[in-house]
């Protein structure tokens, strides 16, 4: 796909925009120091065999003139969109990929910048320089002192992501609407986040104090690094504000006057970094929860089938330890954790019909009230800004960014025993959605005790979080093991009277204590960017020693509050020490030292490592030791006997499982991860880890490569690229569907034609891929349409008659039926890339194989399709297929603000969600990491 890069230089673009705006809105560009050669690092052991990419581009800041030029002329500031084309092109280019073509689709990630490739050098102070390369504009930070190095990292982060960082610190503080506007999406997002991670200023400071008290010398160094990083951010922000080349979004959202320059960019504080860390933790580093919803579906199963049989049915759908699930650690070693106890104790099931969700929002006024929701007000602004009116009317971030299940990112790592060179090969990266600017930013940091290049979340980039060191590379995927429990807290009244469900006092160790109330009052007014009329509301969350109140209910007739207790709550920043270690070449020297560093990270991540000699894996997280007999999948009584072992509510700490009990491995033949089940006996925290998972798309391909031997970087990248355009349903479930349909001759011509289309598509690889680059038309387009229309219909036809409506709906709450690219309900909303993680693929697969009489390990408790009769099952599938085949494309793909109805390619297409003022072209769907590395180290220190 070709992308318009624009023939104007950034200066010319800005000048054109200035002419359009008038001199009063001119924003001079920052003056860079004279370019000087950047010294090549002599500590790079990759030998030119490390590559990476992060779309859409390194530049994430845009002046008001830049934004207007983008909206009027379609131009982009330098390096803000130059990675989108190469990233997109891999969807068509992967089949013929060779090692020497890798950097057509990726960039050389060697340390340093060759002298003839230096675009600019900035020296924000004497002890640090920021060199940017001509090809990508990525900052290469070189410091002579530790403080200067981190100051430079903060300065570079502000150069590239100042607006984004400011936005997310307000998200982290539950203040998005008051900062960016009252759009309905902004309201919903800040409410979802505040519900998960409500804090007050003392809580933020307490996290800093905890690191100082418990982190040793490394903890103290980490906070010193963070302070220098903050100082660098603030230095650039002040310079940009004074020089009037700050991000134009500050003008459009009413924070700075474009004519007088009145207003401010509020200085960042260390506590802002804690708020930012809480956002990262909530998005990608959590696991577990949902026990109330699990209890409700169990009750529905018990109501339909009786206590014993209903529990058995529920457990078969829960799939805590499915024997057919694809595993990351597949050498047979087990790591028992969070499984069902033999004799559950303390389970606190709600009385039927008693559960109510805890209210969050109070005191609504103006456009926050239902009566005035959607009301808009046009503010006065120069006519030249009309093109920018309402750019945030739909919000700055997806409404469901925090409410939807997430667990993205993938990894493919092969031991040197099976590669052509004898050196390990890895293709891996985080799948964090698509935003403009991107949530991640690329950087290289070289200074005392730090030597790394890679990606960091903007605003907490003191260290490279995912990337490469001198002779090793690392990456992560979300593991989301269960580190969150739900407690049923008994309510009480301080005067001894009978409490109601709404009581704000609870029992703790025999005392009747008041709940803490955490509040946030937000108000907004219309701006050029967000015309939502003025409004306000108050958010309120009650906190107990057992966590945050999420629901109210009765248990055995007694009123309770269900609370969510997350191990990482109040500890989101603790992981800073582990990331510091990853960047320290004096600490990470081999697989074991890398695993040791990963032990200092409390986020629930799968960590992968490769150097020239070894590969390794480690699963990190605060895996608490539960009381004996506690079922982690269901609510438990809030009593001392069922608390986490050594639980200290004052700081939310407990006894945790030792490192040896965390899933881990060194030099396994290969590792894959796409948020699949981690290891044998390691209980899945959520529904859906069964016989069919998108991890199978990787595992099948990498296993075949390893069996053949001679694996290269390109071969592994091809395997990833093929999986990235493959429909999981077509590859791993459609064969069983076709077996059932073909069990007898098909007489209906329309159905026969549909089956033939599906068979042809399946035989060709079940791909969702353009016929040629830029065609915007899929091969086997009709089969893809039929599959998209059929899947939700066939699941309902297969399961709803047997389960009954109530249980079917309850299980759909636990696990969504589908997650196709066009469904519009992906982890980061529609057009988000990541697909096929959450769905009923395993249920359909196991049920159909049982009906076909095939061997099924870990089967569903009952057959559902056609009541277990093959002919009746076939009839159900035929009927739903006929209905699906008749659906026109305009109904299957109804269109949205970005796509016309019936446009299949567009419905799938990835769109960089506009967080700043710049827009970008759509790209073809791929299911792959946002930031991605391809590495093969040539030698070792």
What do these predicted ranges mean?
Residues 54, 63, 72, 76-78, ...:
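Terminal end segments
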Residues 447-448, 452-461, 466-472, 476-643:
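Glycine- and hydrophobic-rich flexible loops that cap the catalytic core of alpha/beta enzyme folds
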Residues 484, 603-705, 794-799, 803-807, ...:
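Hydrophobic alpha-helical segments
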């Amino acid at each position: 796909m070709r992308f318009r890069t624009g023939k104007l230089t950034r200066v010319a673009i800005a000048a054109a925009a200035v002419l359009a705006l008038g001199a009063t809105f001119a924003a001079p560009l920052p003056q860079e120091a004279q370019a000087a050669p950047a010294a090549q690092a002599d500590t790079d052991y990759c030998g030119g065999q490390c590559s990476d990419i992060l779309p859409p581009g390194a530049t994430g800041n845009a002046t008001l003139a830049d934004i207007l030029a983008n909206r009027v002329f379609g131009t982009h500031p330098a390096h803000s969109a130059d990675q989108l084309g190469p990233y997109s092109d891999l969807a068509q280019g992967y089949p013929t990929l060779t090692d020497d073509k890798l950097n057509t689709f990726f960039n050389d990630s060697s340390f340093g910048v060759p002298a003839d490739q230096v675009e600019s050098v900035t020296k924000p102070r004497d002890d640090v320089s920021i060199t940017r390369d001509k090809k990508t504009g990525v900052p290469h930070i070189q410091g002579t002192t530790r403080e200067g190095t981190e100051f430079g990292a903060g300065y570079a982060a502000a150069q590239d992501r100042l607006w984004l960082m400011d936005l997310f610190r307000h998200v982290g503080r539950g203040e998005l609407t008051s900062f960016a506007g009252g759009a309905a999406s902004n309201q919903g997002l800040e409410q979802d986040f505040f519900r998960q991670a409500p804090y007050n200023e003392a809580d933020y400071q307490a996290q800093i104090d905890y690191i100082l008290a418990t982190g040793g010398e490394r903890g103290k160094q980490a906070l010193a690094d963070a302070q220098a990083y903050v100082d660098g951010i603030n230095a650039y922000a002040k310079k940009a504000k004074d020089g009037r080349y700050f991000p134009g979004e500050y003008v459009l959202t009413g924070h700075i006057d474009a004519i007088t320059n009145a207003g401010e960019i509020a200085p960042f504080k260390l506590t802002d970094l804690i708020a930012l860390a809480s956002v990262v933790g909530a998005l990608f580093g959590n696991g577990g929860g949902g026990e109330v919803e699990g209890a409700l579906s169990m009750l529905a199963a018990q109501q339909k089938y009786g206590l014993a049989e209903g529990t058995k049915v529920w457990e078969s759908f829960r799939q805590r330890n499915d024997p057919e699930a694809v595993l990351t650690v597949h050498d047979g070693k087990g790591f028992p954790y969070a499984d069902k106890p033999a004799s559950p104790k303390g389970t606190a099931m709600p009385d039927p019909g008693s559960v109510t969700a805890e209210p969050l929002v109070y005191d609504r006024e103006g456009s926050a009230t239902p009566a005035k929701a959607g009301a808009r007000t046009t503010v006065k602004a120069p006519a030249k800004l009309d093109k920018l009116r309402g750019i945030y009317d739909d919000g700055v971030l997806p409404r469901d960014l925090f409410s939807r299940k997430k667990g993205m990112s993938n990894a493919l790592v092969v031991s040197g025993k099976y590669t052509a060179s004898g050196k390990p090969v890895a293709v891996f990266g985080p799948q964090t959605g698509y935003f403009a600017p991107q949530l991640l930013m690329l950087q290289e940091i070289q200074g005392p005790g730090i030597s790394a290049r890679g990606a960091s979340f903007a605003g907490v980039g003191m260290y490279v979080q995912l990337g490469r060191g001198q002779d090793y590379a690392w990456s992560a995927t979300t593991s989301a093991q269960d580190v969150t429990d739900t407690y049923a807290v008994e309510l009480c009244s301080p005067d001894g009277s009978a409490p109601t469900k709404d009581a704000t006092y609870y029992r703790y160790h025999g005392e009747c204590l008041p709940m803490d109330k955490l509040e946030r009052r937000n108000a907004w007014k219309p701006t050029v960017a967000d015309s939502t009329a003025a409004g306000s509301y108050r958010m309120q969350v009650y906190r107990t020693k057992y966590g945050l109140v999420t629901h109210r209910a009765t248990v055995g007739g007694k009123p309770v509050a269900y609370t969510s207790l997350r191990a990482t709550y109040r500890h989101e920043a603790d992981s800073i020490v582990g990331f510091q270690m990853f960047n320290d070449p004096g600490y990470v020297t081999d697989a074991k030292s890398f695993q040791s560093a990963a032990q200092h990270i409390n986020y629930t991540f799968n960590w992968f490592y490769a150097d020239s000699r070894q590969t390794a894996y480690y699963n990190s997280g605060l895996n608490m030791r539960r009381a004996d007999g506690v079922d982690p999948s269901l609510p438990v009584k809030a009593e001392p006997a069922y608390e986490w072992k050594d639980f200290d509510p004052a700081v939310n700490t407990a006894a945790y499982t030792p490192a040896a009990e965390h899933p881990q491995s060194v030099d396994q033949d290969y590792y894959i991860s796409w948020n699949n089940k981690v290891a044998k006996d390691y209980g899945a925290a959520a529904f859906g880890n069964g016989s069919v998972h998108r991890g199978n798309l990787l595992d099948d391909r990498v296993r075949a490569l390893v069996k053949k031997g001679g694996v290269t970087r390109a071969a592994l990248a091809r395997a990833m690229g093929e999986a990235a355009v493959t429909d999981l349903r077509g590859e791993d479930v459609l064969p069983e569907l076709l077996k059932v349909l073909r069990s007898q001759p098909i007489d209906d011509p329309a159905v026969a034609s549909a089956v033939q289309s599906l068979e042809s598509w399946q035989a060709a690889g079940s791909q969702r891929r353009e016929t040629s680059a830029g065609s915007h038309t899929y091969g086997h387009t009709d089969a893809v349409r039929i599959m998209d229309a059929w899947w939700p219909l066939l699941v309902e036809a297969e399961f709803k008659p047997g389960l009954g409506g109530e249980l079917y709906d309850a299980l759909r709450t636990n696990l969504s039926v589908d997650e196709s690219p066009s469904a519009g309900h992906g982890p980061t909303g529609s057009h988000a890339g990541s697909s096929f993680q959450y769905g009923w693929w395993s249920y359909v697969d196991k049920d159909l194989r049982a009906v076909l009489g095939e061997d099924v390990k870990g089967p569903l408790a009952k057959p559902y399709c056609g009541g277990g009769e093959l002919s009746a099952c076939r009839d159900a599938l035929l009927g739903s297929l006929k209905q699906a085949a008749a659906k026109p494309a305009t109904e299957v793909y109804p269109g949205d603000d970005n796509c016309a109805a019936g446009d299949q390619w567009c419905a799938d297409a990835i769109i960089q969600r506009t967080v700043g003022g710049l827009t970008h072209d759509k790209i073809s769907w791929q299911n792959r990491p946002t930031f991605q590395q391809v590495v093969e180290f040539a030698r070792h220190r």
